[in-house]
Each structure stands twice: as C-alpha cells, then as structure tokens.
Amino acid sequence: MRRSLRYMALGVLTASLLSGNALTALADQDVNHGPGVSQAPEVSQEAPGVSGDTTQNGPGITNFVTPIKTAYWNHTPLLLITPQAANKTIGQGGFQEMEQMRLFADAVCYQEEVRDPSRIPEVLNRVIMQAWRNSAPAQMNIPRDMWTQVIDVDLPQVVAFERPSGGEDAVAEAAKLLSEAKFPVILSGAGVVLSGAIPDLIKLAERLDAPVCSNYQHNDSFPGSHPLAMGPLGYNGSKAGMEIIQKADVVLALGTRLNPFSTLPGYGIDYWPKDAKIIQVDINADRIGLTKKVTVGIQGDAGKVARGILAQLSGTAGDAGRADRKALVAQTKSRWAQELSSLDHEDDDPGTEWNSGARTRDADLMSPRQAWRAIMQAVPADAIVSSDIGNNCAIGNAYPTFEAGRKYLAPGLFGPCGYGFPSILGAKIGNPDTPVIGFAGDGAFGISMNEMTACGRDDWPAITMVIFRNYQWGAEKRNTTLWYDNNFVGTELDRDTSYAAIARACGTNGVQVRSQEELTQALHDAVERQMKNKETTFIEVLLVLTILGSRFD
C-alpha cells in the first residue's frame, strides 16, 4: 500500500509489467510479451501524469527498445524501471546480464542507476520529474537483489517544477507577427494535447480567425467540429489543410517539433509555405529550427505560450482579410468534405496496375476508404482510437476527428508495426469507462497478436479491435511494385488464417465482415458489448486484396 501511495504522489497513474522473477515484488497489470507491456502504459493515461513500465532484466528488457523509442518520439512521459543483475555479480556475465543503460541511452531523456537501496526514493523522485519535465521516457536501473529488501527510509518531499512560459522577447515578437499577419495559420501538435492547451488554442484561433491544421497523427489536437479546423497535414491527410496552409504569411507551430511527416507533400501539393514567417513553440529547445527555418523560436509549454501571445495581440490583430479568410476556409473545407466522401479507390502509379486490377477482381469487397467511411458511422463521439502503422491505417489518416485531446493514439515517427493493439489495451486500462477501438492491418496485427490471450482473461478490461484483412504487407508491396517494375516478393500473408477464429479460440468474440453495412453494424454492436457486457471483440474486415496507398519518400 505504501508503495502504491508513493507512486500516486509522484503522479504515476498506471504501471504494467511482464512477469519475471526479478520483479515479483511489484505488480499491477501483466501482459504476455515485452513489446505489449511497454506499449500499453505509453498511452494508458488520459489525465496528465507519468505511466510506468518494467519487465525481467536482460531478454525482457531488450523487448522494450522499440516501444520506449516510440514513446520518446511520441513525447510520452514514462517511467522505465529496469531490473539489473544483482550488485555482487555485475560484470561477471551472469544470468540475463547486459549493459541496460547503454541500451536505452538514445531512447530516454534521462537515466540513473541505483547502487544502494536507501537511495531508491530519492532517485525515483528525480527520474519521474525528468520524465514529466521533458515529456519523454526516463530510466531507473535497479539491481535485482534490491527488489526484495525491506528497509526504513524517509521519503523525500516531492518537488515539482513549472514548465516554462517562453522568453518575454520571443513571445512579444510572436504576438507582433501574428497581429500584423494577413493570413495567419496555426499548426497544432502533440504539445497542445500534453499541456491541456486546446482551450487556449481555441481562444487564440478565434481571436485571429486563424485556420488550424493538425500535425500528422495528432487529429485530436483541435476539435474537428470547429469551423476553423482544417484537419491533419502529412501523408493521406486533409487536402483542405494543405491548400490553406500554403497561403499563410505567418504560421504559428504550437507544441510541435515540425516532424517531417507533418510537412510531407500530399495529393500533388507541396504545401509548406516557403516565404511565410514561422513561429515554432516546443518544450524542447533542441528541436526548434531542427527541420524548418524559423523566424521566432519559443521554448515553453504550449498552453502558457498561447496565453502569453493572446494577451499581447494588438487590437486589430486578425482584422486584415478576416471576412475573405473565413469564407475561403469554409469553402475549402466543404469542397474537401465532398471529395473525401466520394473517394473510393487509390490511383495506380504509371506502369503499375495493381489497384485497377484489384477493383475488377474483388468487386464484392470493400476498399480501405470505403471501410473507413463505414467505420466512422459507428465510432462513438467520446471514443479513444488507436491506429497502427501500414497501408490501410495510413489511408484512413484524414477520417477520424475528435472533440477532445488524448483520444487518438498513433505510432508516430518511430513507426513500429504492432502498436495499435497493445496501445488500445493500455488506453482501456487507464480509461475503463470510455469506449476504445483499435485499428491495425493484418501484417501489423500479427506482430502483437499474442496479447489476444492476455485480454481474454477475466481480469482484463474489454476492448474492440478492427483488423484490416487484405493478406499482404501493403505499404511494402506498394514500394516494391513501384521501384521494381511491378514486381514484389515477401509481401503476401497466409490466406488460410482467420483472426476472427483465433479470437474465438482465445475466449473473446470474433467477427468477419465483407461489406460496409456489415462493418458499421458489427462495430456498433462490438462497442455496445464492450461497454455493457465487458466483452472484447475482434472484427476482421475483408478488403480488396491489392489496394495500395500513395507513395511517400
């Protein structure tokens, strides 16, 4: 009990582990495989805080590298506790020993090793605070012989730090640029969500009548129903957002490192405004100006900086071209909404014919875009959604919209396959009263499917998981057919495997659907069973076998 209270005082909201004899003294929620345990708490909190990860030292810890690096680029505050070989045997090459600090040096913002059990509370304080201050994982390495020791220690006082609000001169200069702008545009990133700054962003955007584009895979950083919401930029994002931001003379990049995928050309549009003045706000000064030239850089919390800028805007800020800008925003959004609702298939590249051939051969099956339209008819407004890496999930980038933050979970720029399933498990653990829906292609799902036997247990909360089934590694097939004269190798998956049947064998519901109507109904029913009966459902969506998304470089 005292241990649990200690974690809570420090803001650790959930802790997950993979069972092992190095950590039998600590347990909260156990999974079946290392990557699953590490992905789960990365997204399990809805309120601001820090989640926890731990597993067996050595081979258990090596499974954490990909998920922890994913959390690093997703800017997730996370406590990583790594059991180490016993103090007396370190360096002797004993059972499951390796240099675990070196292993994570590039994947955490801070790391510290404990060599005396009396220092555990002090180090725990420091590591958690570093994770919170830097919005990133931080590592605490503890020799395994300390885990079962009982000692008397004084718990140090928790010392919290305020996040910075930006330099005075920089905030004033940003306010001046936005006050003078004729076509201001705001780009919202993960920092807006992590700092709870959406209300501040709304006030600033409305004061300027500035359209708001969202960073790639951060669709929940601005309310989708807002008249100024333009949708996500980047791969398969919002054409409306791309058309609008290319007209900007001033861009406020709020809470974002301007990752490359958020400025990637799409639909034949190289939209990043080359002559615009760029104001970049990021909690990490090292990332300001890293990918794009900036006019003003501000190190600070997105919410505090937004409030500071708003307070210093001139009385006429946003007035230049306000009426025309509002009209153009509305027209552009309407035109894109109509186009998106009628998009059914992907175009073939010159010299390839996979998509057109698939439409003829599999005329009775859905395309990915048709599936996404059917899905959005059944997703509850308050749902938390996770998406995996890969062709079918990426094609759906423009479809999900949200009215609140911490609702959209995505693999981010590290791009690990197998993220969608364990991340939605973690979301449900942290938010048991909220409907959750995970999405993954059949290739990506196969990487993490061993957690099906974990979530089938009675002590696990219920989820809904949608698996896009086109029996191929679609993104890789897309690239090989393009680069190698319409040829491919190693991209096909077993057509005799049924994930719906495996789900039923694991004690959960398994459903297979072929049409839009079946998909909408199955998803509606699955979410209802999740919330009313605490039942987990896996929906296997049969798709056209070879619809491949547009290329990215």
Task: Put a short name on every predicted segment.
Residues 1-12:
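Bacterial Sec-dependent N-terminal signal peptides
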Residues 17-25:
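C-terminal segment of classical bacterial N-terminal signal peptides
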Residues 28-47:
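N-terminal propeptides/low-complexity segments immediately following signal peptides
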Residues 51-320, 353, 378-381, 460-465, ...:
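N-terminal alpha/beta PP-like core and its mobile active-site loop of ThDP/TPP-dependent enzymes
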Residues 81, 89-96, 291, 297-299, ...:
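Thiamine diphosphate
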Residues 155-171, 322-362:
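Long, charged amphipathic helices and adjacent flexible linkers at domain junctions
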Residues 250, 384, 435-437:
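Structural motif
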Residues 335-431:
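Active-site diphosphate/adenylate-binding microenvironment
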